Amino acid sequence: MRNKIFSSLYFQVLLAITLGVFLGHVYPDLGADMKPLGDGFVKLIKMIIAPVIFCTVVTGIAGMESMKAVGKTGAIALLYFEVVSTIALVIGLCVVNLLQPGVGMNVDPATLDASAISAYAEQAKSQGIIAFLLDVIPGSVIGAFASGNILQVLLFAVLFGFSLHHIGEKGKLIFNVIDSFSQVIFGIINMIMRLAPVGAFGAMAFTIGKYGIGSLVQLGQLIACFYVTCLLFIFMVLGSIARANGFSILRFISYIKEELLIVLGTSSSESVLPRMLVKMEALGCKKSVVGLVIPTGYSFNLDGTSIYLTMAAIFIAQATNTPLDLFQQITLLVVLLISSKGAAGVTGSGFIVLAATISAVGHLPLAGLALILGIDRFMSEARALTNLIGNGVATVVVARYCDQLDEQQMNEVLANPAAVQKVDQHG
């Protein structure tokens, strides 16, 4: 029993995170030097995300009987994403107005060091709905795979899957090759995931070593508000959605606990995308639904990022004594509904989108971003965890509404923790 606990990925990642916090706190310089361990692990995961999405989506779509089902899945998914993301934005707006974590700071924007956020501001200039939509179309197929752009790979995979389905029996050989290739890719994932504790240790040691636990105290009120809001959203909003669709949010969280710990260590929900594809399929969701909803959700269904964006923007207004009336806050909400779709599930993207939003709205001081730059890294954990749980719940809901969910299998898997071990042996 003891060997089983020690050999479980859950225990190893938890131990690694604890050791990372200890090293970063006691030996901050050494902890900061551990950054390459975390970066290396995330790069290994990113290396195989494009082929994983391609194989999953192509085999999922090409293997379907009706193409109408794919269109229905996409439409329901996008509608769900928009509704739930809006709820997340509104909840963030309500909580930050109710608790007012920035009131009383009386910060003069002119005294803030804007040079620290200049790089983010430059990146933010390229953010825009037209630019975002055009960016979904790759300059070349090879370029899409080389850059690892999730939406570009997804677009090509959907078109490839449709075409493969259309040619019927002639494409059977190609279908079998891609299906076999996907098994090889998931075998690689199993090898990479053995390094998850090393990646989590390095990322956590760097975070604590560079920013220090003390930096949490300075702006702790905003961090506390954000974490509480994320918990409220997960257990009240997502919990209600889960209950309405026949499953428990607590059991679902228990089912993906290893993935949540890896995300906690790396601050990137993208680091477990390949594993989530496998786990959601093992839960009873059809491959075609999983292949469309999970990758698309990484750009269109970032609930944690949505909460963060509204809270951070209003916090800056409160801290710098910038008055925002109801109309201006509604305008901010509408802009965020669009700009939040440009945030990918990677560390730092939420901050860039925040910079883009503040630039677009106009009546908030851009220099105010310097206030939360130091603690953004500490809030990214809650963002990524909420994003991951939100995308998992979305997959089950969409699968259920598209009649692509085996509810008996879902109930059996959620009731039986041993099922998780079977998933880990996939491929």
Curated annotation (Swiss-Prot):
Membrane topology note: Multi-pass membrane protein
Keyword Cell inner membrane found: yes
Gene Ontology CC entries for this record: plasma membrane
Domain of life: Bacteria
Gene Ontology terms: biological process: L-aspartate transmembrane transport
Pfam families: SDF
Keyword presence, Transmembrane helix: yes
Molecular function in Gene Ontology: fumarate transmembrane transporter activity; malate:proton symporter activity; succinate transmembrane transporter activity
Subcellular location: Cell inner membrane
UniProtKB keywords: Cell inner membrane, Cell membrane, Membrane, Symport, Transmembrane, Transmembrane helix, Transport
TM segment ranges: 5-25, 44-64, 76-96, 142-162, 184-206, 222-242, 307-327, 330-350, 352-372
InterPro entries documented for this protein: C4_dicarb_transport (IPR023954), Na-dicarboxylate_symporter (IPR001991), Na-dicarboxylate_symporter_CS (IPR018107), Na:dicarbo_symporter_sf (IPR036458)
Protein family according to the UniProt entry: Belongs to the dicarboxylate/amino acid:cation symporter (DAACS) (TC 2.A.23) family.
HAMAP family hit by this protein: C4_dicarb_transport
Function of the molecule: Responsible for the transport of dicarboxylates such as succinate, fumarate, and malate from the periplasm across the membrane.
Name used for this protein in its record: C4-dicarboxylate transport protein
Source taxonomy: Bacteria, Pseudomonadati, Pseudomonadota, Gammaproteobacteria, Aeromonadales
